Amino acid sequence: IAWSPNDKKISFSHTTATGVELWVIDVALAKATRLTEATVNANIGSPFSWMNDNETILVKMLPKNRAALLDAKKDLPTGPIISNADGAKSQNRTYPDMLKNKNDEINFENIMTSELYKVNLNGTATLFKKADMYAGESFSPDGNYLMLTTIQKPFSYIVPLSRFPSK
């Protein structure tokens, strides 16, 4: 849920059986309107942010050419999993639910990849940035600049997402 900068509208996501939709509420009219189909990518962080014009929302959307997830039971890795352990003490902590193999890497990248769209209040969506693994965005105080953070490869099998390389 996010208020528009002028506090006149509220945007929110709605999870359906087929995905996540973006909706907006006009507070004065007490009316909710769906802006997108169930194509919002809400897998990390906030999937949308208001722009300073109060009329446009920056939205992470699933790429139109998104591949299906790999099934570990059907899709075999292309090579062995190699791990080097020399018996020396390590400073690394252990974490649950880490990437374990190439299939996990491919599925992780697939799930994290979004296209950024500008969606106006009548639901018109315009591609703003091509597909990438967007982890966050931050507008400058005057709204004239946007800083995007993307997750970069190589992925790690020993640290969590928060410690993956980013740009």
Predicted regions and their residues:
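Beta-propeller folds
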Residues: I1-K167
